[in-house]
């Protein structure tokens, strides 16, 4: 009999040794379910305390953890004060050595893309990459022949949230202030300044 209890399947909580109460013979009037009598309430033990949150939950992939940790070069001895400025510049270069990814959206395109601005050396390379990325929407061979890539203006949102035309400021300043790129129809960008082809 003891062997059967070890493999018995029941609906009770694990670790409880209570016997299941037999169902009542007559259901109480006005209730949807028949409940066991009041004496059975004394047999119920208090519920176990809620478990603490598991360490490491929710899971974060290792590459995300390494991206969040700053990458700096550490030295054992303190550098002289004259080299402090050069070291801070080197730390900024190391910290900025990763990519500078921004979202790119296009009017009429059903999806967004992300690009790394540090890959491009100037506005021309950036515009060519954007045209290749959104080829089917900006007048590629598969799109309508009436659509011309020059009908679109490339704009960006800077740190202040202002919408500016790409090409109005030097490229290095553009890279440092750009938060988001948007390819909009030229007719909508007329108020921003002269469109560039």
From Swiss-Prot:
Q: Does the keyword Acetylation apply?
A: no
Q: What does this protein do?
A: Aux/IAA proteins are short-lived transcriptional factors that function as repressors of early auxin response genes at low auxin concentrations.
Its assembly, as annotated, is: Homodimers and heterodimers.
Q: In which tissues is it expressed?
A: Highly expressed in etiolated seedlings. Expressed in roots.
Q: Matching Pfam families, A to Z?
A: AUX_IAA
What protein family does this chain belong to? Belongs to the Aux/IAA family.
What name goes with this protein? Auxin-responsive protein IAA31
This protein's species is Oryza sativa subsp. japonica (Rice)
| SUPFAM superfamilies the record matches | CAD & PB1 domains
Would you say which domain of life the source belongs to?
Eukaryota
What is one cellular component GO term in this UniProt entry? nucleus
């Amino acid at each position: 009999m003891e062997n059967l209890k070890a493999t018995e399947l029941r609906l009770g909580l694990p670790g409880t040794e209570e016997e299941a109460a037999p169902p009542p013979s007559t259901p109480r009037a006005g209730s949807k379910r028949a409940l066991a009598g009041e004496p059975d309430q004394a047999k119920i033990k208090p519920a176990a305390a809620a478990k603490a949150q598991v360490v490491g939950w929710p899971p974060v992939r290792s590459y995300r953890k390494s991206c969040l940790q700053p990458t700096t070069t550490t030295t054992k001895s303190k550098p002289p004060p004259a080299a402090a400025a050069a070291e801070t510049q080197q730390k900024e270069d190391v910290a900025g050595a990763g990519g500078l990814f921004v979202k790119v959206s296009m009017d009429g395109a059903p999806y967004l893309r992300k690009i790394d601005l540090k890959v491009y050396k100037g506005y021309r390379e950036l515009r060519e990459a954007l045209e290749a990325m959104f080829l089917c929407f900006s007048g590629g061979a598969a799109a309508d022949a009436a659509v011309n890539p020059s009908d679109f203006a490339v704009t960006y949102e800077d740190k202040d949230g202002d919408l500016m035309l790409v090409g109005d400021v030097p490229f290095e300043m553009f890279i440092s202030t750009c938060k988001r790129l948007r390819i909009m129809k030229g007719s909508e960008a007329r108020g921003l300044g002269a469109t560039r082809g």
